[in-house]
Each structure stands twice: as structure tokens, then as C-alpha cells.
């Protein structure tokens, strides 16, 4: 049974913000889905780059966590969550680590741009709580992710990827593998 009663706790939470948060939830879930696809591509026996697989699985969990945090915000603010279909990743075969990292950078930049637009909307609607939430939980983390992916792409290029197959193996082992605890 669904109910469409108005919320008792909703205060200073514009409908446009509610709708934008629902779109952001979908975008975060899409990013998680893309990273999950990448993770299991690199985990295949004919690709066998386990640290690429672990790296993208970690990113997938992060994207899902971001979506869940936004869902929690919606319920705390008295809004309603309206989930949408999650778009399928644009490809199933990621070809190589460089291609995957470049696409991941594209995804994270899209997520960041969407967060900036959400922050502007919150500012325009005079919602300091939403502005603070986005600043505290998302913006800095996205900037760090963009820098990290950019560094990985630079290093893969520098090592000769994708033409030099050993580059991905060495990057997987020494760069992504060095973050293991």
C-alpha cells in the first residue's frame, strides 16, 4: 500500500530539489552500475587484472553508497523517493584499463557537474542544509576522484598503454596493487 500523505517533517525543501535529488540518485546508481560492469570485466579469466577489478568494485560500492546517502536525505527532509530505470552501461567489453579509466573519468565528471547544478538549485531555493550536505559529503570527494583518475590515465599513457600490454599488467600490480592493505 502506498500513501501520498504530505510529510509532517518537510520544511524548506522545494519540490525542484526533491526531483533533482531523485535524478542524482539515479545518476549515482548508474555510475555504480558502470563501475560494477568494469570490475567484472577485469575479473574475467581472459583479462585477469585483479587490481583493476578491485579498484572498480570499490568505486561501484562508493557510488551505491552515495545513492543511499541521498535516499536517507530524502526521507530525513520529508521528501519522497521515486526510483527510475538505471541505464545500461554503454558497453560490456571495456577493451583495456586505459579505456575503462577514461570512461570512468567521463562518468565522475558528469556526476560532479550534476552535483554542482544541484548545489546551485539549493542556493537558488535558499536551502542551506542541502548546500552544506552536498559540500560536506560529495564535492570534495568528487574532485579527489577526478584527480585520481586523471593521474591514473596519465600514468597509463606514460607507460605506453594500451599499445604496450605489459603497461597494464605493471600498473595493475604496482599502482593499483600497492593500495592493498
From Swiss-Prot:
Entry function: Stores iron in a soluble, non-toxic, readily available form. Important for iron homeostasis. Has ferroxidase activity. Iron is taken up in the ferrous form and deposited as ferric hydroxides after oxidation. Also plays a role in delivery of iron to cells. Mediates iron uptake in capsule cells of the developing kidney. Delivery to lysosomes is mediated by the cargo receptor NCOA4 for autophagic degradation and release of iron.
Database matches in InterPro entries: Ferritin, Ferritin-like, Ferritin-like_diiron, Ferritin-like_SF, Ferritin_CS, Ferritin_DPS_dom
Alphabetical list of SUPFAM superfamilies matching this protein: Ferritin-like
Entry-annotated residues carrying Phosphoserine: 179
One Pfam family in the UniProt entry: Ferritin
Protein name: Ferritin heavy chain
PANTHER family: FERRITIN (PTHR11431), FERRITIN HEAVY CHAIN (PTHR11431:SF37)
Enzyme class (EC, first level): oxidoreductase
EC code: 1.16.3.1
Species of provenance: Sus scrofa (Pig)
One Gene Ontology CC term in the entry: cytoplasm
BP terms from Gene Ontology: intracellular iron ion homeostasis; iron ion transport; negative regulation of ferroptosis
Homology family: Belongs to the ferritin family.
Amino acid at each position: 500500500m502506498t500513501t501520498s500523505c504530505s510529510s509532517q517533517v518537510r520544511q524548506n525543501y522545494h519540490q525542484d530539489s526533491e526531483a533533482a535529488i531523485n535524478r542524482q540518485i539515479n545518476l549515482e546508481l548508474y555510475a555504480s552500475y558502470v563501475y560494477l560492469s568494469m570490475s567484472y570485466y577485469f575479473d574475467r579469466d581472459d583479462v585477469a587484472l585483479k587490481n583493476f577489478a578491485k579498484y572498480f568494485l570499490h568505486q561501484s560500492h562508493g557510488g551505491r553508497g552515495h545513492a543511499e546517502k541521498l535516499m536517507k536525505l530524502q526521507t530525513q527532509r520529508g521528501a519522497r523517493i521515486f526510483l527510475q530505470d538505471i541505464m545500461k552501461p554503454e558497453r560490456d567489453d571495456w577493451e583495456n584499463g586505459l579505456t575503462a579509466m577514461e570512461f570512468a573519468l567521463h562518468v565522475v565528471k558528469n556526476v560532479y557537474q550534476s552535483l554542482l547544478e544541484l548545489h546551485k538549485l539549493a542556493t537558488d531555493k535558499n536551502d542551506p542544509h542541502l548546500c552544506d550536505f552536498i559540500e560536506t559529503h560529495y564535492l570534495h570527494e568528487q574532485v579527489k576522484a577526478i584527480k585520481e583518475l586523471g593521474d591514473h590515465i596519465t600514468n597509463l599513457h606514460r607507460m605506453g598503454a594500451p599499445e604496450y600490454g605489459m603497461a597494464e599488467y605493471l600498473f595493475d600490480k604496482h599502482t593499483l596493487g600497492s593500495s592493498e592493505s
